[in-house]
Amino acid sequence: RALFGRGEGVACILGTGSNSCWCRGGEIVENVPPLGYVLGDEGSGAALGRNLVNGIFKGHIPLREEFLAAHGLTYEEIILRVYREPYANRFLASFAPFVHAYLDCPEVRAMVAETFADFAQRNLSRYPVHLTVACIGGVAAAFEGLLREVLAHGGYRVGLIAASPAEGLIKYHYGK
């Protein structure tokens, strides 16, 4: 409702987690299950963090020292936080600002683009291609330029991208 009101389109949330649905007339027509950060949540902050940590420790992203210094963590502490402590999704998503800060690094930019392309392939491809795609959430807003680029490259029409649904919900419910 915040993105399309009573219209039609594919509404997406890209924040700590991710979700999408085809909506029409303010109602959900279809939803591809997000499956959470272990099995899904493509395009989310948790996915960006997971892919960053993977890329850094497997040597695909050349920012290991910068990352460890910025977060005051060791490899062992990261593994412990992900596998032994609660809210691993939030922990992984907390690395999104680092990702954003290093977006000019070609390997980071490629990783973010791949993360968004994965979201499109695994989620958006399940909906009719003629529908406009709009996104809400901190990740969507922070990476808006690259998100638009990746979705347009995939053949999607991209509408509104915003950090918060508040303005759209006020408009929907109060007509303002």
Which role fits each region the language model picked out?
Residues 4-10, 53-176:
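ATP-binding/phosphotransfer module of carbohydrate and carboxylate kinases, centering on a glycine-rich
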Residues 1-66:
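Phosphate-binding/catalytic loop of phosphoryl-transfer enzymes
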